[in-house]
Regions:
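A positional "C-terminalness" feature that preferentially activates on distal terminal regions of long
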Residues: 1-426
């Protein structure tokens, strides 16, 4: 059993613990292989031999245990093991690590096999602990200007025999921003970007008037046919996307008053034209959506029903309320291309629905692997750029299958997508 003081819970990573101590590792691998359902398990008989081979090939602690075990067994046999196939409940208890979170008096707060589950369950208490040990003035609210000098990118405070670590960030509170402490750097970065965006918008004139003056009537009309809420919400989405683009161009979030001043001047000077450019692209996207939806209405040929359902699900992931900021400026042109690929697919599907279904099943297989892989990641890891990139690779895979003539920016295949997932560390 691993004892973890509550204030240190956010600093402990699960990776590595599941490998057990070296003396129990072989026994654990054998037990895991034997836990597989019989149709899968028979590919790895005798289990002790495969356990020995795995331990001879794998680099302990380099990857999470199951990631490494699945990868090496697949290399040895060509058999892919679904994550759900492992039956941890059949592994003897003495081979499993237990995590116990304790308070200042060493009293048990909670314990379990999953460190991430404990982090999720005790997140509020960890946050309270961070706020309690923070110096006065670190956390603030109701801010409308950058009036706090330099914002530290990390914060440490000694408590008893250990150091409590937190990550400060600006937090978007709509009419103002706040400074809050986060228990991990991923959430800090995500909050900081949104909070910085809000503080910039609070300190520059709105681009809406300029947008109405400069946007062609056709584009204005396209925005008013927005099926995803009020047009003003869509315009706000375009503005937020524009600020994000300019923050990105400047090198990302800033942490000093001087840096904010320089970024503010850049955004004030360039945001109007940037938002007009974005709104024109959004109008093209919404027009493509409108045209596709027209084709999806009416009687459905049963041979095309599954393909059409797949298209609707794909579109829901591409264009939704908040998609402009959600997808980001760099993806607007890609989003339009993916919609154009859907139009090409509809043309081909009407001619050969069986070929469409065969290609769709290949994409579905990759999507299922991606979803399983995504579910394994800590929640705060799923929004990181390298993780999000996999989703866009699957969109490119669709283009290569259904509308190859449109081209992709790089070579793509189902195998390349799976390899890219393997190379990303949790």
């Amino acid at each position: 059993t691993v004892h973890i003081p509550l204030p240190l819970l956010n600093q402990i990573e699960e990776a590595g613990f599941e490998w057990q101590i070296p003396g129990l590792r072989r026994e654990l691998i054998i037990a895991l292989i034997k836990s597989l359902p019989k149709p899968v398990r028979r590919n790895f008989v005798p289990a002790p031999n495969y356990a020995e081979a795995f331990l001879g090939r794998a680099a302990p602690l380099e990857l999470p245990l199951l990631d490494s075990l699945e990868r090496e067994l697949r290399k040895m046999t060509g058999v892919t093991i679904d994550r759900e196939a492992w039956q941890w409940d059949q592994v003897p208890d003495h081979l499993k690590i237990t995590f116990r979170v304790v308070d200042d008096k060493n009293k048990k707060l909670q314990e379990g096999r999953s460190l991430q589950a404990l982090k999720d369950a005790l997140k509020g208490k960890v946050q309270e602990t961070l706020s309690a040990v923070a110096d006065d003035g670190i956390e603030q609210s109701g801010l409308h200007i950058w009036s706090f000098g330099t914002l530290a990118e990390s914060y440490e405070q000694k408590r008893g025999n250990y150091k409590v670590k937190a990550w400060p960030a600006l937090v978007d509170e709509r009419d103002s921003v706040a400074i809050k402490l986060f228990d991990n750097p991923q959430e800090q970065q995500q909050a900081m970007w949104r909070g910085l965006r809000r503080l910039l918008l609070l300190n520059i004139p709105s681009p809406i008037k300029y947008l109405h003056e400069k946007l062609p009537n056709k584009a204005k009309l396209g925005l008013y046919f927005n099926p995803y809420g009020k047009v003003l919400d869509l315009i706000d989405d375009c503005i937020s996307c524009g600020v994000d683009k300019l923050i990105d161009e400047a090198g990302g979030p800033v942490w000093t008053e001087e840096g904010f001043s320089q970024l503010h001047d850049k955004v004030r000077a360039e945001l109007n034209d940037t938002v007009v450019e974005i709104a024109k692209q959004v109008e093209q996207i919404l027009t493509a959506v409108f045209n596709i939806n027209k084709r999806l209405k009416g009687r459905v040929d049963m041979t095309m029903a599954l393909g059409l359902s797949d298209i609707k699900a794909q579109m829901a992931g591409l264009v939704y309320r908040g998609f402009v900021t959600g997808n980001g400026f760099r993806r607007l042109g890609d989003t339009l291309r993916y919609l154009q690929a859907i139009e090409k697919r509809l043309e081909k599907m009407a001619i050969d629905p069986h070929r469409d279904r065969a290609q769709m099943l290949k994409v579905e297989s990759v999507q299922q692997a991606w979803q399983q892989w995504l579910n394994k990641l800590p929640p705060n890891r799923r929004e990181d750029d390298d993780v999000r990139e996999i989703r866009w690779m699957i969109e490119e895979l669709r283009v290569s299958f259904f509308a190859q003539q449109l081209g992709t920016p790089y070579p793509i295949s189902d195998k390349r997508v799976l390899q890219a997932m393997e190379q990303i560390t949790p």
